[in-house]
Amino acid sequence: MLKAFKEFAVKGNALDMAVGVILGASFGTIVKSLVDDLIMPPIGLVLGGVDFSNLFVTLRDGAAPGPYASLAAAKQAGAVTLNVGVFANTVVSFTIVAFAVFLLVRGVNTLRERLEGPAAPKQQACPFCFSKIDVRATRCPHCTATIG
């Protein structure tokens, strides 16, 4: 049983999947930092100094009445908040990751098409009646001529 598990774990699919999950998590962390630290601060500055990580709407005050200076202060007071800024950061992060995955898949598909070459035709024209027939056919179903 241990030998079978070792063979499964070392084979390409399980190992490739593990590497993909680890790299995906690391890439997600990098994108989160990119959004939180490099993209959203200039956007917030252009929009009048808005700090997106602290952009929230208080739905119900907590133990201490609002307004709260930050999202952390609202959470500490037990307020119920709608975290609009955190959601905006998450949407931007998702968009970047989705676009990166799209580019990766598109590149892999293009490379695969170049390596495999054009697909073999599945149909041919009958040399007698010019009808489309399967390339494996030995007799034309339209004119009954023998092919081949």
Curated annotation (Swiss-Prot):
Protein name: Large-conductance mechanosensitive channel
Keywords: Cell inner membrane, Cell membrane, Ion channel, Ion transport, Membrane, Transmembrane, Transmembrane helix, Transport
SUPFAM superfamilies referenced in this protein's UniProt entry, alphabetically: Gated mechanosensitive channel
Organism: Nitratidesulfovibrio vulgaris (strain DSM 19637 / Miyazaki F) (Desulfovibrio vulgaris)
Domain of life: Bacteria
Quaternary structure note: Homopentamer.
Gene Ontology molecular functions: mechanosensitive monoatomic ion channel activity
InterPro entries: MS_channel, MSC/AndL, MscL_channel
Segments traversing the membrane: 15-35, 84-104
Principal localisation: membrane
Membrane topology: Multi-pass membrane protein
One Pfam family this sequence matches: MscL
Keyword Ribosomal protein on entry: no
Family: Belongs to the MscL family.
GO cellular component terms, A-Z: plasma membrane
Record function comment: Channel that opens in response to stretch forces in the membrane lipid bilayer. May participate in the regulation of osmotic pressure changes within the cell.
UniProt subcellular location: Cell inner membrane
Organism ancestry: Bacteria, Pseudomonadati, Thermodesulfobacteriota, Desulfovibrionia, Desulfovibrionales
